[in-house]
C-alpha cells in the first residue's frame, strides 16, 4: 500500500448507544488529533435534516439523505471525527476506522434517566446496549479490520479509549 501524504488525514466514526460516552471521546479526540468533530445529531438539528418527529420516542427522525449530502464534501477532505448513534447508512468508503463505544447497562440507564428519556425510549436504548446492536451493526456494515470496541463507563475508560484511537491513528499514518 502506498504511503499517505503527510497532510492527509483519515475519517473516524465514533458510534454507540446514546449515553455510552461518544461525545466526551469525540471532543477530546478531535482536539488532540486536530480533527473536525462532526456531531450528526447536532448538525441535523441545526440544518433541519429531519423527516418527521417520533412522538412515541420523543425524538426527531433523521433525513439521512440530506445529512449525507451535507457531509459528502467534508468527508472528501478527511480529518473528521464523526459522531452518531447509528452507522449502517454511512458509505463504507467514508471511514478508515469505526469505533463503537459500549457501556454497562446500569451506567447507561443512569445517564439516560439524567437526560429525562421517557420510559419507552430508555428501555429501547438499554435493550440496544444489552444486545450489542450498534456493535453488530458496525460489524455488518464495515470490514472487520476497521471496527473496534471502546469502553465508555468511566473517565479511566475514556482515557484508555482516547489512547487507543491515537495509537490507531499513529499506525494508520505509517501505512
Curated annotation (Swiss-Prot):
Residues that, per the record, bind ATP: 19, 21-24, 115
Annotated stretches, region: NMPbind: 39-62
The EC number(s) this enzyme carries: 2.7.4.3
Main location: cytoplasm
GO cellular component: cytoplasm; nucleus
Catalysed reactions, as listed in the record: AMP + ATP = 2 ADP; ATP + H2O = ADP + phosphate + H(+)
One GO MF term: ATP binding
Pfam families, per database record: AAA_18
InterPro entries: Adenyl_kinase_AK6, P-loop_NTPase
LID: region residues: 114-124
Gene Ontology terms: biological process: ribosomal small subunit biogenesis; rRNA processing
Keyword list, A-Z: ATP-binding, Cytoplasm, Kinase, Nucleotide-binding, Nucleus, Ribosome biogenesis, rRNA processing, Transferase
Coiled-coil ranges (or none): none
Subcellular location(s) per record: Cytoplasm; Nucleus
Subunit structure: Monomer and homodimer. Interacts with small ribosomal subunit protein uS11. Not a structural component of 43S pre-ribosomes, but transiently interacts with them by binding to uS11.
Family under the similarity heading: Belongs to the adenylate kinase family. AK6 subfamily.
HAMAP family hit by this protein: Adenylate_kinase_AK6 (MF_00039)
Its biological purpose: Broad-specificity nucleoside monophosphate (NMP) kinase that catalyzes the reversible transfer of the terminal phosphate group between nucleoside triphosphates and monophosphates. Also has ATPase activity. Involved in the late cytoplasmic maturation steps of the 40S ribosomal particles, specifically 18S rRNA maturation. While NMP activity is not required for ribosome maturation, ATPase activity is. Associates transiently with small ribosomal subunit protein uS11. ATP hydrolysis breaks the interaction with uS11.
Name of this protein: Adenylate kinase isoenzyme 6 homolog
